[in-house]
Amino acid sequence: MDFIFKCVSGNEIVFKGLDTEGKVKGIEGYKYLLFDELDHYLREEWNQANISLRGMPGMKLFATWNPVSEKLWIKGYLDSMEWDDMPLVIDDDPYTQLHHNSFVRRSKDGKTILIKTTYFDNKWAVGGEGYGFLDQNLIDEYEQLLLLDPNSYRVNVLGDWGVPEVSRPYCQNF
């Protein structure tokens, strides 16, 4: 099923499910493709999408994921590239300032941008000067997670790569 958002300008944003490999191979007429939760896809599926869209002017692949394990193919893929750090703020605009635990990097070949953000960058949770709001309950939950499950805190709060742990397998099964 497709979901289509029509903008006032007349542009459309089309959300199309690509839940089978055949759909990715047959995609036509799209310039942008978003993989939400890339950690749930195989490297081969990412490669197939890249091949399917190659040659289209302005084609871009986007992906979001949580770095749940340093053993994910994504980490190896990113580690194989060389990166340049980019500024954490655009034109001294405080609304674009990223937290010190975040980063923006561009691959040396200029084909890939990597942006790491955390909840500290979400001004609708942590508040901002003149905008957003402070969600103290959410912040308290995140900070409690540090005490209960440091690995989950590292992944879900700080956005760092997770390290598989088996020290408390009973607790993590329930």
Predicted features and spans:
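Long, contiguous amphipathic alpha-helices that act as assembly "spine/axial" helices in icosahedral shell
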Residues: 37, 50-54, 149
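Loop/turn-to-beta-strand initiation segments
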Residues: 11-12, 31-32, 57-63
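SF2 helicase catalytic motif II
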Residues: 29-46
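Short clusters of hydrophobic/aromatic residues that line enzyme substrate/ligand-binding pockets
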Residues: 24, 74, 157
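ASCE P-loop NTPase helicase motor core
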Residues: 42-139
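Inter-Walker segment of RecA-like/P-loop motor cores
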Residues: 1-31
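Alpha-helix-centered segments that form part of catalytic cores
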Residues: 16, 114, 172
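ATPase catalytic-site recognition across NTP-hydrolyzing enzymes
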Residues: 122-174
